[in-house]
Amino acid sequence: YRPVWRETIELPLGDISVHFAPPTAAAGTVAAEIWAMMNDDKRYRDADPEERPHLFVEAATRAYADRAHWLNTDGTSSIKPFDLVASSRIAKMMSTYNSDTHTPIASYNPMPVEVVQDPAATTFVVMDRSGSAVSCALTMNGLFGSGIVTSDSGVLLASVPGSGGRGPLSLGPILATDHFTRDFFFAGAASGGVTAATSLISVIIKNLVDIEDLEK
């Protein structure tokens, strides 16, 4: 197994660049679409506080429904990752949005498809005193991996990626940096299966857009 370097899905927020993990870390792409829909044309900033939870749910529902359109069986995307968050595409996805009414699921095209996701994952964020940071998400492809411990080293072996959500489907760490200086602003990662993307976006939207105190 060798590491593979991939370009992130990068979205702007003023002078800040928010980096999302690309497929096969599908939760990163879902999070990127949610972020794009909420921030396109300053939609979230301009929304009344009472509308914002509704906007969040509508954007998340559209992102998960859209996943059925681009997600291949091996976790890759049938569409180039950055094209998934192109302004024209995001505008089309939000064209049916109504600030006062829930959009019926039956009207979605494509329709949402149930995808089994294994919540077995862990995440961590590390920052050093010079201001460098990493945001990581990893999985052993199942609770306790394969359940096999090597006799000589005591290492618990990971399971083989496969059906039942075993793999990087629910992974999606986020990193926000200054677009010009690359100074670090925010790093976050979440586990928990299907809820990872929405949990993380709900935090990052409050701390990068609402500028809410993290202690809250």
Q: Which residues are covered by each model-predicted region?
A:
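Short loop/turn motifs at secondary-structure junctions and domain boundaries
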Residues: 1, 114-119, 166-167
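Structured, charged N-terminal subsegments at the starts of enzyme catalytic cores
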Residues: 1-56
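Short, small/polar residue-rich loop motifs at catalytic or cofactor-binding pockets
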Residues: 5, 118-121, 143, 169-171
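Second-shell loop/turn segments in exported
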Residues: 17-23, 45-47, 113, 187-191, ...
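Generic recognition of stable, solvent-exposed alpha-helical segments in well-folded globular domains
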Residues: 26-33, 51-58, 88, 119, ...
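Internal maturation/activation junctions in enzymes
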Residues: 40-139, 153
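Active-site rim segments in enzyme catalytic domains, especially the processed small/beta chain
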Residues: 127-203, 210, 215
